[in-house]
Design a protein with these regions (language model features):
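Catalytic-loop region of hydrolases
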Residues: 2-9, 28-128, 434-486
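N-terminal cap/lid subdomain of alpha/beta-hydrolase-fold enzymes
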Residues: 73, 79-156, 366-386, 396-399, ...
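Conserved acidic catalytic loop of the alpha/beta-hydrolase fold
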Residues: 157-172
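Alpha/beta-hydrolase fold nucleophile elbow
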Residues: 170-180
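Glycine-rich nucleophile elbow surrounding the catalytic serine of serine-hydrolase chemistry
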Residues: 178-188
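A catalytic-pocket lid/entrance helix-loop region that shapes and gates access to the active site
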Residues: 196-259
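Alpha/beta-hydrolase fold active-site neighborhood
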Residues: 248-374
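Catalytic histidine-centered segment of alpha/beta-hydrolase-like enzymes
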Residues: 424-435
Length: 486
C-alpha cells in the first residue's frame, strides 16, 4: 500500500493472463489431505500441500534464502452472494517460513507484487506472509467484468475464503495488515469477519466517514510543516498555472511522442489541471519537512518548474494509460470509499474546470457508478464501538491522516491503539514511532500473534522484532502515487 515509480494521480498501486471464470474447480475450502506414507504434515512439501486445496493453482516459485516463495491463484466467486454466477482467479503470493509460525495476511488494496518482500508485522513475529491481490486489479479481474461486484464486502469475503482455505495448513495465529488502501482493506475485513484474525495492523489508513465534509484537509494544509515551506509550495503551485499554456504545450508534445492519450479526462489541459492540484498534496504525502529546500523558486525557469511538477505529481498519472491500471480504485472511491477535496484560495482565477478533481472523472463513462451512502460510517462505528486488538499507525505530516480512524471508549481495554509517527509521511510505520509507543505496538503485535517472549509479557519495553532486518526483503519504499489515491 511500494516501489518508487512514475507518479500517478493523486486520488489514489502483470504477470500473464490466468484462467478465468467457468472452468475453475469447486469453490469449497476443503481441508488438506493426502500426504503420502511416512510423510508428516511438517515434512510434506509446502507447495504440494497448498495445491491439494481445491481451487489452488500454481504460477511460479522464486528462490529466497530461509523461505519458500510461491505465486499462486485461488478460484473465487465473482459474487459471494451468488456463488453460482461465475468465478475468477485471484492472484496471491506466499512467503513460507514454517507452519509452526504465525501468518500475516497482507494486502496493498491494489495489485500484488510478485517480488519476495516482508511487511513490518511479518518481521516482528518472524512468520509467514500471504499477500493477496485486490479483486478487479488485473489479472485478478472477472471476465466479463461486472463492476457492481467490486465493493468492500465482496473483497472481505475474498480474504475470508482464502483464509479459511489456508488455515488448514497454517494453524497458528493470524494477523491482517496493509498500508494505505491496504490498511483500509485490513480494517474492512475485520469489520465483516471480526473473528478470523487475532489482530490487525493498519498503516496510514484514511477514514472518509462524511465524504461531503472535507474541512479536516483544509485544517491540515493550514498547519503542516512550517509556514515558509507552505507558502513556497503554494507559490509554485500558482506559478504552474500562470505558465499553463507553455507547459501544457510541452505536456501534449510529450504525450504525442510517448503514445499517451487523454480520452478519459478529456484533454491535456484538463489532465494538467489535475496534475497541478496534486502538487502540494503529493509533496507532503511522499516527502518530509527536510525536503522543502528542493522546492524551486517562483521565478525558476520553466524547465526547472516542469521537472519539479513531474517529479512530485507526475505527468503520466492522468493519461488514459496512467489511469487504466487504477480504475478499480477510482471506481471504489466514487461508490463507497470517498475522496478528498480541499480549498485552494491561492489559485483563484486560474482554475478552468470546477469539479474536475473527482473520481467519476477518472473512470470511463461506460462503467456506471453510483454513490452508496453510509458504508464508511458503518465501518467507523464498528471500529469505535466493537473492534478489538487493532493498531492504527499514521504519519504526522501525511495528508491522508487528516481523516483517520478514531478509537472509541475503553479502547485500551479492547487493546485498540492509534499512534502517530512524528513528522512522518505516507510511509510511516511502527519503527518510526517514539520509543514507548514503538515498544507498546511491537509488544501487542507479538502477543496477538502468540509469540511474545516471557520477557515481553512481563515488560513491553523488551519488545523488538523476532527476525533480523533483511535489507532486500524488508525494503518498503513508498509507492509514488498522487494525492487522490492512498
Amino acid at each position: 500500500m511500494r516501489t518508487a515509480r512514475r507518479w500517478l494521480p493523486a486520488l489514489v498501486m502483470c504477470i500473464g493472463t490466468l484462467a478465468g471464470a467457468g472452468a475453475a474447480p469447486a469453490l469449497a475450502a476443503t481441508a488438506v489431505t493426502g500426504t503420502s506414507a511416512g510423510e508428516t504434515q511438517e515434512t510434506a512439501d509446502i507447495k504440494d500441500r497448498i495445491l491439494q486445496i481445491p481451487g489452488m493453482h500454481f504460477v511460479e516459485e522464486k528462490p529466497y534464502q530461509g523461505y519458500r516463495y510461491l505465486v499462486l491463484t485461488y478460484t473465487q466467486p465473482v459474487d459471494h452472494r451468488h456463488p453460482d454466477r461465475g468465478t475468477f482467479e485471484q492472484r496471491f503470493t506466499l512467503l513460507h517460513k514454517s507452519t509452526d509460525r504465525p501468518t500475516v495476511f497482507y494486502t496493498s488494496g491494489y495489485n500484488v507484487s510478485t517480488t519476495p518482500s516482508r511487511s513490518e508485522p511479518t518481521r516482528i513475529v518472524d512468520g509467514n506472509q500471504v499477500s493477496m491481490e485486490y479483486r478487479f486489479f488485473t489479472p485478478s479481474r472477472p471476465q466479463p467484468a461486472d463492476w457492481s461486484t467490486l465493493d468492500i464486502w465482496q473483497a472481505a469475503n475474498d480474504q475470508h475464503r482464502l483464509y479459511q482455505a489456508l488455515k488448514t495448513v497454517y494453524g497458528k495465529n493470524w494477523l491482517a495488515t496493509g498500508g494505505s488502501k491496504g490498511g483500509m482493506t485490513a480494517t474492512y475485513y475485520r469489520r465483516f469477519f471480526p473473528h478470523d484474525m487475532n489482530g490487525t495492523v493498519a498503516y496510514v489508513a484514511p477514514n472518509d466517514v462524511h465524504n461531503g465534509d472535507d474541512r479536516p484537509y483544509d485544517r491540515f494544509f493550514a498547519t503542516v510543516g512550517d509556514k515558509a515551506c507552505r507558502t513556497q509550495l503554494d507559490s509554485v503551485q500558482r506559478e504552474a498555472l500562470v505558465r499553463r499554456d507553455e507547459i501544457v504545450a510541452r505536456y501534449q508534445k510529450w504525450a504525442d511522442e510517448n503514445g499517451k492519450t487523454f480520452k478519459v479526462v478529456g484533454s491535456a489541459d484538463k489532465a494538467y489541471e489535475n496534475v497541478v492540484l496534486d502538487l502540494v498534496w503529493s509533496f507532503w504525502q511522499y516527502h518530509l519537512q527536510s525536503d522543502c529546500a528542493s522546492v524551486p523558486a517562483t521565478k525558476a525557469s520553466t524547465d526547472e518548474l516542469y521537472k519539479f511538477i513531474d517529479t512530485i505529481s507526475g505527468f503520466d498519472g492522468y493519461t488514459d494509460q496512467g489511469l487504466e491500471r487504477f480504475t478499480p480504485y477510482y471506481y471504489q472511491a466514487g461508490t463507497e470509499l470517498g475522496s478528498p477535496t480541499f480549498k485552494s484560495p491561492h489559485l483563484k482565477g486560474l482554475l478552468r474546470y470546477p469539479g474536475i478533481y473527482a473520481p467519476r472523472n477518472y473512470v470511463s463513462r461506460d462503467i456506471p457508478m453510483k454513490w452508496k451512502p453510509g458504508v464508511m460510517a458503518d465501518v467507523d462505528r464498528w471500529v469505535r464501538n466493537d473492534s478489538t486488538q487493532m493498531l492504527f499507525v499514521y504519519g504526522q505530516n501525511d495528508p491522508w491522516g487528516a481523516e483517520p480512524f478514531r478509537l472509541g471508549r475503553n479502547a485500551a481495554a479492547r487493546h485498540d491503539f492509534r499512534f502517530v509517527a512524528p513528522g512522518g509521511n505516507h510511509g510511516s510505520n511502527i519503527a518510526q514511532l517514539v520509543a514507548d509507543e514503538r515498544a507498546t505496538a511491537t509488544a501487542e503485535v507479538l502477543k496477538w500473534a502468540g509469540v511474545a517472549p516471557a520477557a515481553v509479557q512481563k515488560d513491553e519495553r523488551h519488545a523488538k522484532p523476532l527476525a533480523p532486518y533483511d535489507a532486500k526483503l524488508d525494503r518498503q519504499p513508498v509507492e509514488r502515487e498522487a494525492s487522490l489515491r492512498p
